[in-house]
């Protein structure tokens, strides 16, 4: 626990005894505690334990330890803090803790809202379930409160992903075994067939109710006609009966519909979740060759967009399934109404069908291409923002923005084609009902010379039924096409080869091992017999021609490689004919060799990651702990990273912290080991990340430890501590495989494996037997031989440990942790409250062009008006015949339309009817009817084209704004925002804007304008209906208002719960080798399931709210229909027959249109949540200063560094820097000058400020005060690109990007091929490139993840050589290379940059002792800055102390290198 205030007499902390982890103790650092007046806080100390192998003494149980005037106190949490007493404490209040992940995790805190309760739906009775009454109190709660995730009830047991997976996996495994072409959906139907069937039954009953409605509409119209003809022959109450039957029928239909919707949504979400889970599990098992075919971005796309396609399909699957039956039944009933003219409708649909099918097939083709380009875009985004710091340091923003825009441009090109085909299909199907109406009624009139009202309006009702499936058919077919492509991609991924690492239960890795070998090799150990392992990579397409002159083309040289995945996988690096056997406890196998020899590959071969190429065998028996060269860190607390799912054991935990030298680090953290490390360990230095990874391995208490160059990321002193206290200490009884460049530890090995360039084993023997013949391992290199012999003699020196553990890399943590007083680095994801703001709608409207949107909106209004006017004209036409045939004497009072709106009738036409009842000007009437229909179709075409153009512009502009906003964000933004959260904007949110938002907006505008038109028609036809409709409309408003306040909150939470799924997935992909080595795949699958369940409970709650709303709106719509029928029955003697049919037909469709309009509004709001999230980033993310300031650009040749004006080239003047405003300074008034050509070495104690100095120079962090001057220019006054492009850095953690070797060396295409080859020769990668090139790829060799860290650092050096900078920064540039390569790099830097200013930060003092001056930093200030010879002679110098700490012989060697 953390106790921030120990000075309060009344402090009282209650602990939960049920917390399993609270059984241990908490280690708290008490510094300078004020004891005055605090007699109750007295802590007794006892049981001191000293560890001779380490300078860090700690006390067990209630003990204490002094170090640097700090006291470490162990508290037993079962005792109250007030019962402790502090002895000899100093006056300081900072503290740190370890041992308790969450002190209040298991406390029975009261749950707010419905949190922790069983699902309300699961507990609902039959009536409540059918009518969604159970959701009423939840809607009311959301209306009054701001909803939080923990206030939503628990997910129902039958919706939990683990339960669903168990059901599905049986059928999927059978499908894989028994089918040549496994069908995921077939397995899904077997698993959830009853749910599909139940949904179809409910929807089918709803469809039946839809067809019953027009039947009773016809009966009501007939009732009025018969009553008018002969009142005595008809029961006057018959109209009320029909009205009641119509109401009950509509109510039952609504109940069935919304039950069907909920079942379908639940089933679709289940399958979507299963796809996400299957993709996640599969990504944990892919072989290297399979993995090389799929980038992280492509796999993320499967989880986000492809899984979503299935969910979208299920939202309209019932409409799609019943579309054809509904059309067929409608045609039969239509034939019953109008006779053979109904075949005109069939003919029109038959003609349009081939066109629709053709468009559908084109949609499928373009969707497949579009998905491929989407994968490429996401791949670039993922890679960019994972390496954003490198991109900023190299000033590569423009290059990567062009690369990104190129990918997005290709995606938009196919998106445009896709949307064009989709909208052309929409135009056809939306126009078909109008075209059918024109032709059918025209033919009917020409044949029968009349239009009977009862038949015509029944026909109109059936056409309205047809209109719904026809309207949704293009959307549904479009989604089906996308789904078909997506499910094909998912199945292809699930069918990829899986790695076979042996028996998880028995902790074995078996590769090509026979039963006899298993019987012989039963002891814990490593048994490798004549194996040749290889990596597999994707070959490149035909390489471009070589460059003889620098290219002006700044686009990505690897931009046109979208077809690469179709190529066969070819072998790159291989580890040849390797044999070894390690089975004795306490064995230490050391693997050494030059850069690129295969040390890391050997480690991964032992893990079963490489592919066996011959008949050899590998068997690893026992549990394995693995530490990679680049430490993999989880986004969790430091403690969670160490425990890694194992039970907390206080004694071992303390021992691990001690031997991994982590105790001093905990002193820097406000929350000790509870500190949140951050994504990719961003909150820790390289050395700290490595030590946390080592601590994780040590705590696991495994049988075999595979350690890949773990000492490179720490300084020599900490390296010694780790070697003697971990490898030769706590792990002395374990089998350890250590790949290393630290040759001074070779004498301690029991076996040594020497690899040479190309992956061949040079020697495998004891170190003593090897030392005499070592020269041959490196081509008889006398330099390497001398170094190895020197290290062998120095090894004895290393036994001595000092009283201090000083990790130079620890600085970063202290600097970063000024940012972390609460121990939290990752920010909480932003979330707006209330309904979607109007400004977000305007954001979307203006993005596509406000004028275009207004034209489209006007098109919807006019289109709906003309469509409605067509039916009104039809009703007016039929009324002339009906009125003539019934009672000409009542004509003056029978037409309510004329009486209520005579100005409309008078202005439209003046119809003369002859004695036979024929319309004299029928030709004019027919001509107007056709003209209106044609105008309606033309308007549909025009507004669709305009809307299409608008949507493409909008999505293009929004993505551009998002990309540039994040690219220009300061570095702290990426340190505090998880990558998964950023990726979510570029995947799911962008996909919604690209594909779904325009659909929702289109349909909302369509249905809402329909509702307005219907209300206008009803008010004209039956104006007395407006009075009872008013309270219904008011009630309608409040219901939808309550709903929207609920739905938008749930949608926002759903979006937020989606981000951790992506973050966890990205984290898993980066650490999959570590997870497999520790056999932690199962635990991470459980975590994935938990994250899915959180997201699913939000989604299903949202869907339940949708059905709640829909049913209640249906009730209101059905009430309007009931009232309309009642009023018609009451006014049966005077109402116009045309008004009867028009009013009822439109009230019937009003229910559907109101529901659809409100649902689409809700859907639009949920989709607009993506606009909210994107606009938040585009409008609220802080931006870096301008890349270029035209008014203050540096002169050509800047910086010249010629000293022409007699001023130092680099001047720091009173530099003060904080990571953010309001945080403590990490650089405190630093001032110094650097002369032209000077070589400056920078070192210092923990938290000294070295990294901060570097960040200030590159303006990664802006200064709080002071200034930095380079060659006479204040760098804060010039653009970032102008500054950073003139500096060069060789980073500690080098990055190679997807693409070619050429693009990685010369991203800006500024150099010729010959220059690039020359650099490769200088950094000694020329032969390696020639060897691994396929088909003479050369510089166009495609790079992959199999390049070693050392090789990547050499590429970083190559970039600097090509750039020829005036100022070079080396940030531990030789950390991951062997001694020979270290010497090579140092020699190249000395020779090639002899005139440049060089700033070198290093753990290894040998890399800086030959500098002109040494700068020693401490606590953000310069404490020493002088020549190394002067500092080394000063006994009180910190630099002199650091030299002495390397050991007697090594310190003598270092002093011999110092210039005098």
Curated annotation (Swiss-Prot):
It is a multi-pass membrane protein. GO terms for cellular component: membrane. Its main location: membrane. Residues 37-55 have a biased composition (Low complexity). GO terms for biological process: sorocarp development; transmembrane transport. ATP binds at residues 593-600, 1244-1251. Keywords: ATP-binding, Membrane, Nucleotide-binding, Repeat, Transmembrane, Transmembrane helix, Transport. The keyword Transmembrane applies. Residues 1-23, 37-68, 537-567 are annotated as: Disordered. It is found in: Membrane. GO terms for molecular function: ABC-type transporter activity; ATP binding; ATP hydrolysis activity; ATPase-coupled transmembrane transporter activity. The keyword Repressor does not apply. The chain crosses the membrane at residues 196-216, 238-258, 320-340, 425-445, 456-476, 842-862, 922-942, 1014-1034, 1108-1128. Residues 196-482, 853-1166 form the ABC transmembrane type-1 domain. Residues 560-783, 1210-1444 form the ABC transporter domain. Pfam families: ABC_membrane (PF00664), ABC_tran (PF00005). Residues 551-563 have a biased composition (Polar residues). PANTHER family: ATP-BINDING CASSETTE SUB-FAMILY C, MULTIDRUG RESISTANCE-ASSOCIATED PROTEIN LETHAL(2)03659. Belongs to the ABC transporter superfamily. ABCC family. Conjugate transporter (TC 3.A.1.208) subfamily. This is ABC transporter C family member 5. It comes from Dictyostelium discoideum (Social amoeba). The gene is abcC5.
């Amino acid at each position: 626990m953390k106790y921030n205030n120990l000075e309060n007499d009344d402090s009282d902390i209650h602990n939960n005894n049920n917390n399993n982890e609270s059984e241990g103790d908490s280690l708290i650092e008490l510094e300078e505690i004020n004891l005055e007046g605090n007699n109750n806080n007295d802590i007794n100390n006892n049981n001191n334990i000293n560890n001779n192998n380490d300078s860090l003494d700690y006390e067990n149980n209630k003990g204490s330890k002094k170090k640097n005037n700090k006291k470490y106190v162990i508290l037993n949490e079962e005792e109250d803090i007030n019962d402790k007493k502090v002895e000899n404490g100093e006056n300081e209040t900072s503290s740190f803790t370890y041992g308790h992940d969450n002190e209040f995790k298991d406390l029975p805190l009261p749950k707010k809202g419905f949190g922790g309760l069983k699902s309300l739906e699961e507990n609902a009775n039959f009536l409540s379930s059918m009518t969604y009454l159970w959701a009423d109190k939840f809607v009311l709660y959301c209306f009054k409160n701001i909803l939080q995730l923990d206030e939503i009830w628990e997910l129902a047991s039958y919706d939990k992903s683990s339960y669903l997976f168990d059901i599905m996996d049986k059928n999927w495994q059978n499908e894989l075994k028994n089918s040549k072409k496994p069908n995921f959906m077939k397995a899904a139907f077997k698993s959830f067939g009853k749910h599909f069937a139940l949904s179809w039954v409910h929807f089918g009953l709803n469809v039946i109710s839809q067809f019953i409605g027009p039947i009773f509409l016809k009966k009501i119209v007939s009732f009025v006609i018969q009553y008018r003809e002969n009142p005595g022959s008809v029961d006057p109450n018959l109209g009320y009966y029909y009205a009641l039957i119509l109401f009950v029928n509509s109510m039952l239909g609504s109940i069935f519909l919304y039950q069907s919707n909920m079942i379908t949504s639940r089933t679709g979400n289940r399958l979507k979740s299963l796809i996400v889970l299957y993709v996640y599990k599969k990504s944990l098992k892919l072989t290297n060759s399979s993995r090389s075919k799929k980038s992280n971005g492509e796999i993320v796309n499967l989880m986000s967009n492809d899984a979503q396609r299935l969910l979208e399909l299920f939202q309209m699957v019932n409409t799609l399934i019943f579309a054809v039956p509904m059309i067929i039944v409608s045609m039969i009933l239509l034939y019953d109404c109008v006779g053979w003219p109904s075949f005109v409708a069939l003919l029109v649909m038959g003609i349009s069908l081939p066109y629709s099918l053709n468009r559908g097939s084109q949609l499928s083709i373009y969707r497949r291409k579009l998905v491929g380009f989407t994968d490429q875009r996401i791949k670039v985004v993922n890679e960019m923002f994972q390496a954003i710091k490198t991109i900023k340091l190299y000033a590569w923003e423009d290059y990567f923005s062009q690369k990104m825009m190129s990918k997005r441009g290709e995606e938009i090109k196919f998106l445009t084609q896709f949307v064009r085909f989709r909208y052309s299909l929409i135009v056809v199907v939306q126009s078909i009902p109008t075209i059918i109406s024109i032709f059918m009624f025209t033919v009917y009139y020409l044949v029968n010379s009349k239009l009977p009202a009862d038949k015509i309006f029944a026909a109109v009702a059936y056409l309205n039924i047809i209109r719904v499936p026809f309207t949704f058919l293009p959307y549904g077919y479009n989604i089906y096409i996308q789904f078909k492509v997506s499910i094909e991609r998912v199945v292809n991924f699930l069918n990829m080869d899986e790695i076979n690492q042996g028996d998880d239960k028995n902790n074995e890795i078996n590769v090509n091992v026979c039963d006899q070998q298993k019987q012989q090799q039963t002891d814990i150990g490593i048994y490798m017999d004549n194996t040749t392992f290889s990596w597999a990579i994707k070959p490149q397409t035909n390489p471009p021609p070589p460059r003889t002159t620098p290219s002006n083309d700044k686009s990505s040289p690897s931009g046109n490689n979208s077809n690469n995945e179709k190529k066969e996988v070819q072998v790159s690096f291989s580890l040849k004919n390797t044999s070894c056997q390690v089975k004795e406890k306490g064995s230490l196998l050391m693997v050494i060799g030059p850069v690129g020899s295969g040390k890391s590959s050997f480690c991964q071969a032992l893990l079963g990651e490489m592919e066996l190429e011959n008949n050899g065998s590998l068997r690893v028996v026992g549990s394995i702990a693995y530490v990679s060269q680049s430490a993999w860190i989880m986004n969790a607390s430091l403690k969670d990273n160490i425990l890694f799912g194992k039970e907390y054991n206080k004694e071992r935990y303390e021992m691990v912290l001690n031997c991994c030298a982590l105790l001093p680090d905990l002193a820097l953290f406000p929350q000790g080991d509870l500190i949140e490390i951050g994504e990719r360990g961003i909150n820790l230095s390289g050395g700290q990340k490595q030590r946390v990874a080592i601590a994780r391995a040590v705590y696991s208490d495994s049988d075999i430890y595979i350690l890949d160059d773990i000492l490179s990321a720490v300084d020599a002193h900490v390296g010694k501590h780790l070697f003697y206290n971990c490898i030769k200490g706590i792990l002395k009884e374990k089998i350890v495989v250590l790949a290393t460049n630290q040759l001074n530890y070779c004498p301690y090995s029991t076996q040594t494996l020497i690899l040479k360039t190309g992956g061949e084993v040079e020697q495998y023997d004891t170190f003593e037997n090897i030392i005499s013949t070592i020269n041959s391992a490196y081509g008889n290199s006398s330099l390497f031989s001398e170094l190895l012999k020197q290290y062998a003699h120095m090894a004895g020196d290393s036994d001595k440990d000092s009283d201090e553990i000083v990790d130079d890399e620890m600085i970063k943590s202290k600097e970063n942790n000024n940012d972390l007083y609460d121990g939290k680095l990752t920010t909480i994801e932003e979330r707006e409250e209330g309904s979607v703001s109007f400004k977000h709608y305007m954001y979307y409207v203006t993005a596509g062009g406000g004028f275009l949107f207004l034209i489209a909106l006007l098109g919807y209004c006019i289109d709906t008006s003309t469509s409605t006017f067509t039916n009104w004209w039809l009703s007016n036409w039929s009324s002339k015949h009906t009125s003539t045939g019934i009672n000409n004497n009542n004509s003056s009072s029978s037409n309510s339309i004329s009486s209520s709106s005579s100005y409309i009738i008078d202005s439209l036409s003046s119809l003369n009817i002859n004695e036979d009842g024929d319309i004299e000007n029928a030709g004019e009437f027919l001509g107007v009817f056709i003209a209106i229909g044609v105008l309606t179709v033309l308007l549909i075409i025009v507004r669709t084209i305009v809307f299409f153009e608008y949507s493409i512009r909008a999505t293009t502009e929004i993505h551009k704004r998002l990309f540039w906003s994040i690219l220009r964000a300061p570095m702290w933004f990426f340190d505090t925002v998880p990558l998964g959260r950023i990726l979510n904007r570029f995947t799911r949110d962008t996909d919604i804007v690209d594909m779904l938002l325009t659909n929702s907006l289109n349909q909302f505008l369509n249905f809402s304008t329909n509702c307005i038109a219907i209300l206008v028609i009803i008010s004209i036809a039956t104006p007395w209906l407006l009075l009872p409709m008013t309270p219904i409309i008011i009630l309608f408003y409040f219901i939808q208002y309550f709903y929207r306040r609920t739905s938008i909150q749930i949608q926002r939470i759903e979006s937020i719960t989606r981000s951790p799924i992506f973050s966890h997935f990205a984290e898993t992909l980066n650490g999959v080798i570590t997870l497999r080595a520790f056999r932690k795949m199962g635990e991470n699958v459980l975590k994935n399931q938990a994250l899915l369940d959180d997201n699913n409970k939000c989604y299903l709650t949202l869907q339940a709210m949708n059905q709640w709303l829909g049913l209640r709106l249906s009730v209101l719509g059905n009430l309007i229909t009931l009232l309309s029928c009642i009023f018609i029955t009451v006014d049966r003697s005077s109402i116009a027959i045309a008004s009867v049919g028009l009013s009822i037909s439109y009230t019937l469709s009003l229910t559907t249109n109101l529901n659809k309009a409100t649902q689409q509004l809700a859907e639009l709001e949920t989709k607009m949540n993506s606009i909210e999230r994107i606009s938040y980033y585009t409008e609220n993310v802080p931006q870096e200063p301008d890349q270029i300031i035209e008014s203050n650009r540096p002169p050509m040749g800047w910086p010249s560094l010629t000293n022409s004006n007699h001023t130092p080239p680099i001047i720091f003047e009173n530099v003060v820097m904080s990571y953010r405003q309001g945080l403590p300074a990490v650089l405190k008034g630093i001032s110094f000058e650097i002369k032209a050509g000077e070589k400056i070495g920078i070192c210092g104690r923990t938290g000294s400020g070295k990294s901060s100095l570097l960040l200030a120079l590159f303006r990664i962090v802006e200064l709080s005060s002071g200034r930095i001057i380079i060659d006479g220019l204040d760098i804060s006054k010039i653009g970032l690109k102008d500054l950073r492009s003139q500096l060069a850095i060789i980073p500690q953690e080098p990055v190679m990007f997807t693409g070619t070797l050429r693009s990685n060396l010369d991203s800006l295409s500024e150099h010729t091929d010959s220059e690039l080859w020359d650099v490769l020769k200088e950094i000694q990668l020329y032969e390696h490139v020639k060897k691994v090139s396929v088909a003479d790829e050369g510089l166009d060799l495609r790079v992959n993840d199999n390049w070693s860290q050392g090789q990547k650092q050499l590429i970083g050096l190559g970039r600097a050589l090509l750039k020829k900078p005036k100022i070079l920064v080396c940030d531990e540039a030789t950390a991951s290379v062997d001694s020979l390569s270290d010497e090579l790099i140092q020699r190249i830097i000395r020779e090639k940059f002899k005139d440049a200013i060089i700033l070198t930060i290093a753990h290894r003092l040998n890399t800086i002792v030959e500098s002109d001056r040494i700068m020693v930093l401490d606590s953000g200030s310069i404490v020493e800055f002088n020549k190394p010879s002067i500092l080394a002679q000063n006994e009180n110098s910190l630099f002199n102390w650091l030299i002495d700490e390397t050991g007697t012989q090594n310190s003598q060697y270092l002093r011999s290198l110092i210039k005098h």
